[in-house]
Amino acid sequence: MKPISLQERYRSANENTVAMWAKNAGIGEVREESYYDPAKLALATGIQPPVSFNVSCLISELQRLTKDDPLADTLPAQGFHFTFLPLTLPLYNLNQPLPAKVAQLTNIWAEFHGRKIVIRNLRLVALPSQLLLAGIPETSAIAMRQSFSEKVLASQWKNELLMRHTNSALPAPFWHSTLLRYRAAFLPAALRQFFLERQASDFADAAGELTLAKVNYNWTTCYPLTESVR
């Protein structure tokens, strides 16, 4: 995917979301369940870049705005991450041993472990009930992700990977960190305004080294895997 294509995807997502908000003034139906299992862990790959001053301020402002709203799930700064490729649904309890075939996964990952990726020109992208911080990856990162995805699809982890992507493309087009999940159909007016006031802002770049880990849904719990993990 060329960078301009991804820029157009982000722009289109924002336009579609704003149009949908215009037709729905309220928050709509409240979700009874969380987006993801809050307790179980999944296998995923990604980066945990340093939190820049501008991104730290953005998250703090969002936290202040949502602190009294029980429907808002705002990402803590310590969970700031960009997923490279999510591998499984939340399948594992905290101390549950991973299956023996994890050895195959760590062997595949060895080629990618510790590689640095850079995501540039971070900007807010709005979905009807979420706010993302998304950017443009370097071409090498796109190629690496495609290669890793193909290797996993050719492994014993194919079914887990396909189940994780039942409702999304493989690999997913956006390179993003989810800053806010709202447990309703649409964001409330204050959060819509928060986005509209900042949608043109550039939050610079994010860079980090790739890791394979057992994580909770927002990476505030993260256990990197090594060759010794079974």
Predicted regions and their residues:
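Histidine-dependent nucleotide/RNA phosphoesterase domain, centered on the 2H-phosphoesterase fold
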Residues: M1-R230
